[in-house]
Amino acid sequence: DAHSHIGGIADLTPLGEDLNEITNPLTPELDAYYGINPKDKCFGYAIEQGITTSCLIPGSANVVCGWGMAYKSAGEHRLIKDPVALKAAMGINPKGCYAAKKMAPMTRMAIANLMKKYLRDVKDYMAKKAAAGDDATKLPPYDLGLEHGIPVIEKKIPLKVHSYMHDMMTLLEIAKEFDILVTMDHAQGASDFADELADPHVKGVVFGPTCEPLFPGEGGKLDYECCKMLDDRGVNVAVMTDG
């Protein structure tokens, strides 16, 4: 399962929420590893449905959310790899969370700006580290959030982005500008951009979940057919549970 939150969202109350840190729109320093309860009964449900491995990621309240990992549904040694991606989000999730607080990002403009600013900051941080060389006195102050972005800039992991049809071209533009790999997660409306998404900066499209209700605007098109359209164009495609 290429997009899941099982083990980190035990119920629908704040006390059961351990993968969605709705306090700052930029939380790249976080790691889903520390929010997972390996004894969560949802792992048993996953096994029953044939899901042996999940990409467990922080929730999508923030523009940059934190690292995600690959994790087995059962067994003694369950962590496969951490990180596998840096989770990010565009559209209604960060807009909805922070508009209620009367703070940025309330618009898609602000989301794009914050995402680009973070990536610029990571590149600047990397340049300062490189310029310092072996001189520890010239190194910039250690910043875990910026450190978590270095594998993205180096194309070792993708930026894994919650994105619907109103955000896909913006995300592709950002991926090209910073020469990074991205996955487009949820991706409702991708059939409108099938040709454009067949781009080397798009590591993959993770569609779904297929059972969610339609909602106005960006979530108003549940186009299952995009999976075949993208596959025909050589795009890596998966279907998520969003568990």
Regions flagged by a language model, labelled:
Residues H3, A46, L171, L230, ...:
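Divalent metal-coordination and catalytic microenvironments
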Residues K39-T183, Q188:
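Polyanionic/metal-chelating signatures
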